[in-house]
Each structure stands twice: as C-alpha cells, then as structure tokens.
Amino acid sequence: MTALPQDTDWTADASRPAQARIEREAHKLEKRLCREVGRAIVDYRMIEEGDKVMVCMSGGKDSYTLLDILIKLQKRAPIHFDLVAVNLDQKQPGFPEHILPEYLAATGVPFHIENQDTYSIVKRVVPEGKTTCGLCSRLRRGILYRVADELGCTKIALGHHRDDILQTLLLNMFFGGKMKAMPPKLVSDDGRHVVIRPLAYVPEKDTTRWAQQRQFPIIPCNLCGSQENLQRKQVGEMLRDWDKRFPGRVDNMFNALQNIVPSHLMDGTLHDFQHLKATGIASDDGDKAFDAEEFPPAPALPGLQVVQIS
C-alpha cells in the first residue's frame, strides 16, 4: 500500500465544499431579501425620487437587516434617495451605547443618536409586572416623528416583517375583535409623516438567517421584547408551529391580506348591504354563497395515515 504524504491537508480539502455551500446559500438569501424588499417598495410606492429615508435602528436583527438591504438597493436603484439611520437611546440600564455608533460609522451611512430617558418614565408609570410595550412605543413614536422633522426626512422606515404583520392581524382578531394588521405604508395621525415597512414581504426566518450570516452586533431589548408570556409571543410561536407542520399555510394567510372580498365579509362600512337589491344584471361579485369552496388538499399530519373511504 502506498503511504500518503505526511503533509496532506485533509481538513482543508473537506472544508471547501461546505464553505462553498455556505457562500452559495448566503448569496441566494441576499438575492431573495433584495428581491422581496424591492418588490414591496415598488408595489406600495414606498420610496420615490429625492426621498430622504429615516431608517429606525433598534439594534435588533430586523432593523439591521432593513438598513443593510436598503444600502444595497440604494446602489442599484433607478432613482436617487438618501438614507439616514436613527437610533433612540432610551437610557436602559446596561445599554451598550457604543455598539450602534461604531457599526453605523463603519457603514458610511449618515446617522443620528437621539438620547431620551424614556426608560425612567415607563418604569415610573407602568406598575410592576404589567406590559410596558404600549407606553414605550407611544413615547418612542413621538420622539422619532420629531427627529424626522428636524432631519428633513420624507419617509420613516420601520423594520416590521411579514410575521409581525400576521401576528398583529391575529392579535386584533383574537383579543380586539377586529380585522386589522400593520399596513405596509401609512400616514401618521397628524398627517405629517409617511411611515413605510420595506420588510413587509420578508419572513422572520430570513432576517434571522441574514443577521447570523452578517454577524450583526445584536442589542437585546429588556423593556418589552424580553418579557415572557406576552400575547404577541404566544401568537408568534403558534405561527411558527403552523409553518413547520403545515407548509404554505402562513404564506396563504399573508396572501389573503392582499386578496380581500368585502362583499363576502360582514362590515357594512366596506360593502353597502343596506341598499343591496336585485338588478337583473350579472355581477362579478355575485352570489357564490351556496357553492362549495374548493381548496387544495391539506398535507397529512405526521404519524397519521390518510384513508380514502368510498
């Protein structure tokens, strides 16, 4: 038997295919993120020529992903728009103040750190054990609107993704008795600011993978996101479970938000049921109430055998 050379590098040879696969998957993920963010921007006309977009940075995976992909799209977009990254330092104890400024400086994107002690206000006003999310978000929103005015920004970009939108829909249905989600684009209550959500088509699993791939310096939120047993967390876990057990279900739920049939719901403000009368004219929105809905067959549950009974 011929002996192998002693200097044979087995580790290097074995690692090349694995490394190539990792790089290939990362490239596919980047292309998908750019495609989905670009599609949302076009579908809802989120960014226009000459816009100055304020990208709100929390230090979480989603806002990092949002800024990162917008920087990539800015370089290839057919229009000119500017970016400015803004972080609100809410003076939480132990908050690593150096992380975001150092990261943002390295990107080359103009940035602004707004220092406001909302942490003390929230802790003083909200009783111990109660959810702080509502008050924290209202305080943060007001400050960010003011900063947008001061910086001359025409759009405010938030990092909410597809799963956030679906969670909000289900939370409103389960606990609020209304069909309401997060819009991809909205005008603020005072009519002065346009808020956009460029990650609207992006599933959370993609922002998680991108954050890992890019090794973003994640800053955890100790005020709201880390509180246990919140309704949003429970709904999020339910959606993730559905996504694993019933492939396509979450996608179809999201698609339903873009495919509304008001005449087949029960909201009289969206469809005039009061004055509905027979006209003798065929309607595309006509009566199919007695037709059996046709749906694709659901996949069998794990461990169960599907038996056809004739």
UniProtKB/Swiss-Prot annotation:
Pfam hit, one: ATP_bind_3
UniProt motif PP-loop motif: location: 58-63
CDD domains in the cross-refs: TtcA-like (cd24138)
GO cellular component, one term: cytoplasm
The protein's required cofactors: Mg(2+); [4Fe-4S] cluster
Cofactor annotation comment: Binds 1 [4Fe-4S] cluster per subunit. The cluster is chelated by three Cys residues, the fourth Fe has a free coordination site that may bind a sulfur atom transferred from the persulfide of IscS.
Gene Ontology molecular function terms on file: 4 iron, 4 sulfur cluster binding; ATP binding; magnesium ion binding; sulfurtransferase activity; tRNA binding
This enzyme's EC code(s): 2.8.1.-
Note: The thiolation reaction likely consists of two steps: a first activation step by ATP to form an adenylated intermediate of the target base of tRNA, and a second nucleophilic substitution step of the sulfur (S) atom supplied by the hydrosulfide attached to the Fe-S cluster.
Protein name per the record: tRNA-cytidine(32) 2-sulfurtransferase
